[in-house]
From Swiss-Prot:
UniProt-recorded name of the protein: Chorismate synthase
Textual note on the cofactor: Reduced FMN (FMNH(2)).
A Pfam family it matches: Chorismate_synt
Organism whose genome encodes this protein: Pelobacter propionicus (strain DSM 2379 / NBRC 103807 / OttBd1)
Lineage: Bacteria, Pseudomonadati, Thermodesulfobacteriota, Desulfuromonadia, Desulfuromonadales
Assembly information from the UniProt record: Homotetramer.
């Protein structure tokens, strides 16, 4: 089982992740993780903090000479802005200064609910941990999961599908081509005309103190059939992936395959017909079985079916507005405008990178459940045996 915990506040000294269950023998270098961290910091519409933070990971345990050891992995991402917050965010009681307390909750954020739940009078005690800054270290965890999956021909990528109501379409091309094309775009978008309109909307929103959300699409290729299970509710792969995506800050909805469109079509236009070709032998394509459509998004009955896994996640607009909405001061109980924290106008491109990361972790977890071993060698032996078996079915 692959599991992890993260710790750290947005303006604390660092973000930390501890990963348990990574097998021995996975090639992993800091630069591999740093590439993913750099992708997260890109994107049209990001705020001034991205000019301060140049995220770099430190691997403190679990790796020796460029390979995982099977012991817990500890990954650390420093917050470069910490020096400016070392007093406000100090763990020492002598630095307490309640005159700087944040008392005006932002609509759409964790501020109010967290304050009521935990009894905090200073909303900074909530907003620091609930901030999307935490996703930096989750991207680092996802990079480690991607490194494992690559050893077995499984790749995770994606595109920005929508920003502010502008919908992008992809060219009729391979996923690899689409990912490479999206990587050249400041919005991770393959549709040039849509990208220009998205950028215009982001500029308009920034000028008016507003924010924009959108939709990201994560695609996983090379996945063998049989990950997940139908036998219990909490083992269903689509349920687990949906939970992983919904755990990302500001994500409010998830679709698998064509998702909600299935509710609008008759069954004959939804379900993917099954064909067999004995010449097809790859486990990632279901052995000899294949489909000519993929409305299911690669998952049926809670299990992968050998087709590409397609997931979409809807991100709401960031709740920190430079033209703030109405709120109530929790100290005086008087109506006020909500507090303003440094933030982005549009973080949809960053959300795509985070979405890829959490999906990679869950796919890796399901893969290890199915083919698990203490080392890459053991897992490869188990995986190859499975591939040979399904070729005969």
């Amino acid at each position: 089982m692959l599991r992890y915990l993260t710790a750290g506040e947005s303006h604390g000294p660092q973000l930390t992740a501890i990963i348990e269950g990574m097998p021995a023998g996975v090639p992993l270098l800091a630069e591999d993780i740093n590439r993913e961290l750099a992708r997260r910091q890109q994107g049209y519409g990001r705020g001034d903090r991205m000019k301060i933070e140049k995220d770099q990971v430190e691997i403190l345990s679990g790796v020796r000479w460029g390979e995982t050891l099977a012991s817990p992995l500890t990954l650390v991402v420093k917050n470069r802005d910490w020096e400016n917050w070392s007093t406000k965010m100090s763990s020492l009681p002598e630095f307490r200064d309640e005159s700087q307390a944040v008392t005006r909750p932002r609509p759409g954020h964790a501020d109010l609910g967290g304050a009521l739940k935990y009894g905090h009078r200073d909303l900074r005690n909530i907003l620091e941990r609930s901030s999307a800054r935490e996703t930096a270290v989750r991207v680092a965890v996802g990079a480690a999961a991607k490194a494992l999956l690559r050893l077995f021909g499984i790749r995770v990528g994606g595109v920005v599908r929508e920003v502010g109501g502008v919908v992008a379409t992809d060219p009729a091309a391979s996923f690899e081509y689409i990912w490479a094309s999206a990587g050249q775009s400041p919005l991770f978008c393959c549709d040039g005309a849509a990208e220009q309109e998205m950028k215009r909307l982001i500029d308009d929103a920034k000028g008016s103190g507003d924010t924009l959300g959108g939709v990201v699409e994560v695609q996983v290729i090379g996945v063998p059939p049989g990950l997940g299970s139908h036998v219990q509710w909490d083992r269903k792969l689509d349920a687990r992936l949906a939970m992983a995506l919904m755990s990302i800050q500001a994500i409010k909805g998830v679709e698998v395959g064509i998702g909600f469109e299935t509710a609008r079509r008759p069954g004959s236009q939804v379900h993917d017909e099954i064909f067999r070709d004995a010449a097809r032998t790859g486990a990632d394509s279901g052995g000899a079985y294949y489909r000519t459509s993929n409305n299911a998004g690669g998952i049926e009955g809670g299990m992968s079916n050998g087709e590409a896994i397609i997931l979409r996640a809807a991100m709401k607009p960031i709740p920190t507005l430079y033209k703030p909405l109405r709120s109530v001061d929790m100290l005086t109980h008087e109506p006020f405008q909500a507090a303003v924290e440094r933030s982005d106008t549009c973080a949809v491109p960053a959300a795509l990178v985070v979405a890829e990361a959490v999906v990679a972790v869950e796919i890796a977890n399901a893969f290890l459940e199915k083919f698990g071993g203490d080392s890459v060698q053991e897992i490869r032996r188990n995986y190859q045996g499975y591939c040979e078996r399904i070729r005969t079915l």
